[in-house]
Regions:
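Amphipathic, interaction-prone secondary-structure segments
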Residues: 36-74
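Acidic, proline/glycine-rich low-complexity IDRs
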Residues: 1-35, 67-136
């Protein structure tokens, strides 16, 4: 199954918003490439030709944050609840596109757990099963 994604480039270390359509293996390879080089990264992913939301993942070190951008029936943004990898009162700076933003432990996940959830979304198209979403 194909996916559409935009991501941080390895060489420039900047987010490139131009979408790429590929199979999920190419997307996984790009994620692993960034992780191997310890580059902070940001992805926007969606399922092509289907009315589904877009997910984003920003990661740095061992932590990540996942957002959902829905357009139907009304444009809304959500952030996925954290997995306890960072205490609720603590915070982590994670990338949103090319800028770092501060997130509390309530919405921070372990990077590999977050990536597994993004992959699950791309396989099923469903977001409700990923966890609790908080409206922004």
């Amino acid at each position: 199954m194909d996916v559409v994604w935009s991501a941080t480039e390895v060489r420039s270390r900047r987010f490139r918003p131009t979408p790429v359509r590929s199979d999920q293996a190419e997307l996984d390879d790009h994620f692993r490439w960034l992780r191997r080089r310890r580059i902070r990264g940001y992805f926007e992913v969606e399922i092509p030709d289907v009315e589904s939301p877009q997910l984003t993942i920003g990661f740095r070190g061992e932590y990540a944050v996942v957002h959902m951008l829905a357009v139907a029936p009304v444009a809304q943004s959500f952030v996925l609840a954290g997995d306890g990898s960072v205490p609720n009162g603590a915070y982590v700076d994670l990338p949103v596109r090319d800028e770092l933003a501060r997130f509390t432990g309530e919405v921070v996940l372990g990077v590999y757990r977050a990536w597994d959830l993004v992959r699950a979304f791309l396989q099923t198209g469903r977001t409700a099963e990923l966890g609790d979403w908080h409206a922004l």
